[in-house]
Amino acid sequence: MGIVLRQSFKNVVATYLGFAIGALNTLFLFTYFLSKAQYGLVSYVTSTATILSPLIAFGVSNTWVRYYSAYTDRQEQGKLNLMLCLLPLLVILPATLLGSMAYEQITQWLSAKNAEVRPYVWLIFLTAVAMAYFEIAYAWMRVQLKTVFGNFLKEVFHRVGMMLLLVAVYFDVIDFHQLMWGVFWVYALRMFLMFISAFYVRRPTFAWGLPQGKKEVFLYSLFVILSGSVASVLMDIDKFMLNQYLPISEIAVYNVAIFTATVIAIPYRSMYQIVSPLTAQFMNQQKPQELANLYKRSTVNTYFVSMVICVLIVVNAQQCYALLPDKDYSTGLWVLIIISVVKLSDALVGFSNAVLLNSPYYRTVLFLGVFLVIGAVLMNRWLIPLYGINGAGVATLIAFSSYNLLKSVFVYRKYGLQPFYKETLQTTLFGLLAIGCFFFWDFPFHPLVNIGLKSLLVAGMSVFFLLKYKVSEELVRLISKFRN
């Protein structure tokens, strides 16, 4: 657990730095320097690229994590590396050809409700390619158990780049069109830096030919396309579909709420980067006891930290909206609360995903994910016209809750692993009590002062609860070291 905690802590620091910069961008620079329509357009392009990137990556990032430790022969590893580097071309080349042939039809469909999208359709595809190859290089770092710099690039680099672009727009160094292309170049530079780092840490060997078990590797990659797409589609399909039904400015309101709630997932995302390859190792080496211990401790630690963050966000939400220049952004309050529940459920059951993707049962779960994506699309089509952005939030909640519940049931039936321990129940009760105590009132001061005072009270309550009930041995030891 030592390497998990060390790298997870560093990843959490880098991720929170990224989200701090992202918060500055999302809550202030975007809202002050761009119109809501411009902000919505940036969000739409990046969200659609995020949906496409797992398809373009052809599942390679997860496949590398799943199979790298299973190949011990250097020659076979070289063949595996070559195969996985070339697989994305099976999507990129046909997609480029199809996009060239059907460009007019695609642009008409995407810009039917909002004509502003039309000039940036190709930009969506190029950004998706840069995102996909970044994840492939990052997967190589993860199988070497070196996740910190990659996580820094993943969470911090592009947000710093976006901040610089927004400042450049504000001072009229570039115009909005140049900013849109600048977004692509930020992601492209991030991809190149990731490849340089990956080769520096350990240069991959390549050997001509296909590895043993090539059919299994190929089929796993094929199915993981669906898995990666499921997570991306479930999280970003709402923004994509909002463009089809509502003014693009509504995406800006929705994005502020989504980004704020996403902070809850930081501990899970950071720990997952190192837990996933360790899970693959324990499963390949058939060490069920070590796997069960890793699963429980990771779940308990992550869920408690995520719950504290969730409480802080929900009880301070109204004061945060009071700081924004356009009061229309506050219409996203219920979206923020709904998506906070989604992110909290991810923190609770998310490590089941690492078990499933590294198990022989991944096909069943991926097919399940496809049906859930279809359900999410249908629910968004039904709820967005009726309830606007709140309908999109409810559709996301239903889809993710169903997906997480079914994954947890499957893991429990096959491996006897489940996230519902005494510690997670205690943490849930703590979260409900804290929100009940602090959500319905505010101090009569400036919003920043109110946020600071409430946060101090919540932090004190959290530390008291942790020390009294000892829901996490690692966190208790960490606090004890800090006190000493």
Positions of PLM-derived features:
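Interhelical loop/hinge segments that connect adjacent transmembrane helices in multipass membrane
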Residues: 1-4, 116, 172, 176-183, ...
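Signature of the first transmembrane helix
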Residues: 3-62, 92-100, 127, 219-248, ...
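Membrane-interface junctions at transmembrane-helix termini in multi-pass inner-membrane proteins
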Residues: 5, 130-153, 340-371, 411-413
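Transmembrane helical elements of multi-pass membrane transporters/channels
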Residues: 7-23, 182-198, 211-281, 301, ...
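Helix-loop junctions and terminal segments of transmembrane helices
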Residues: 57-72, 143, 257, 261-299, ...
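Interfacial segments at transmembrane-helix termini and the short loops linking adjacent helices
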Residues: 103-124, 313-343, 350
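Hydrophobic alpha-helical transmembrane segments
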Residues: 152-202, 220, 258, 370-375, ...
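Membrane-proximal transmembrane or re-entrant/amphipathic helices at the cytosolic face
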Residues: 439-484
